[in-house]
Amino acid sequence: MSGNTYGKLFTVTTAGESHGPALVAIVDGCPPGLELSLEDMQRDLDRRKPGTSRHTTQRQEDDVVEILSGVFEGKTTGCAIGLLIRNTDQKSKDYSAIKDLFRPAHADYTYHHKYGIRDYRGGGRSSARETAMRVAAGAIAKKYLATQGIQVRGYMSQLGPIEIPFKTWDSVEQNAFFSPDPDKVPALETYMDQLRRDQDSVGAKITVVAEGVMPGLGEPIFDRLDAELAHALMSINAVKGVEIGAGFASVSQRGTEHRDELTPEGFLSNNAGGILGGISSGQPIVAHLALKPTSSITTPGRSIDIDGNPVEVITKGRHDPCVGIRATPIAEAMMAIVLMDHLLRHRAQNAEVRVATPVLPQL
């Protein structure tokens, strides 16, 4: 069965290709009465859209979202919310020379073997263009979560060899890299300019944080909250790794260092990333995701054609030298969608659960 839908109670279904006429989404399960405007979604879409700096693809898409259903007089009705974003700046001729070739490290080869047919224009369905609808749907989830005191934010924590320490949220929206350290921005710009001259690409690491999440979200065993987050974040194009909390650094930690001790004043650390036993602990939920270097580069690479003959491939078109630069709002959206779904699932089963133990304050 095709995997175009995510969620159990809050579901998001997307459709559309990179060079098709439009992208569409159906968002179902949103409670009625939520105040929702185009601006609520457009704000995040503008953070993701291409062509916003010299360091991203120069494809010019306005990414203007249209609401087709599910909203009346500025409020959600409880019915399915239909969304549409029209593609306006396709240049399909850029891909005519490679329609019978497989671009290295792309989905061309695997889509061909799975379906026997593929839209070669910009990668078709496998293109990161699809994530625009995730961001629109995620904005709805973020709007509802905010009414519950939950905030989801992200930032770039590494670009290539440059590690970016967290300094302030105020810096994140003030530069094209979503860098939380303004002092790192000049180095990032210099690195990206050199990368473009080298006709190469690079990967990145994104950190996304949810604050205000109450204890109890997550459905053991198979739908543990961390498992669901890993699933959702790994579904983003180019993501090759996900960590929750300390992640792989846990390997070198001792138990006395890793365990998050509890006191009446709160947890003493957050190596678990806000999730214990697959259930939210009330601490900030922290996830990191690694994105591979962009596969579309102008440096020639070896491959084969559809008949199995060796060829040399030079990818033309307009591409991001680092897909991670625009990935922060996408990661935020997917975390918000997961939390929204699990909030509704928890409420459906455990709305009457009450315990005397106080909820510990967040760090």
Swiss-Prot record:
Its EC number is 4.2.3.5. Pathway: Metabolic intermediate biosynthesis; chorismate biosynthesis; chorismate from D-erythrose 4-phosphate and phosphoenolpyruvate: step 7/7. CDD domains: Chorismate_synthase. It catalyses: 5-O-(1-carboxyvinyl)-3-phosphoshikimate = chorismate + phosphate. GO terms for biological process: amino acid biosynthetic process; aromatic amino acid family biosynthetic process; chorismate biosynthetic process. FMN binds at R125, S126, S127, N237, A238, G277, K292, P293, T294, S295, S296, R318. Pfam families: Chorismate_synt. Gene3D superfamilies: Chorismate synthase AroC (3.60.150.10). NADP(+) binds at R48, R54. Reduced FMN (FMNH(2)). InterPro entries: Chorismate_synth, Chorismate_synth_AroC_sf, Chorismate_synthase_CS. SUPFAM superfamilies: Chorismate synthase, AroC. Keywords: Amino-acid biosynthesis, Aromatic amino acid biosynthesis, FAD, Flavoprotein, FMN, Lyase, NADP. Its cofactor is FMNH2. NCBIfam families: aroC, PRK05382.1. PANTHER family: CHORISMATE SYNTHASE (PTHR21085:SF0). Belongs to the chorismate synthase family. This reaction introduces a second double bond into the aromatic ring system. This is Chorismate synthase. It comes from Ectopseudomonas mendocina (strain ymp).
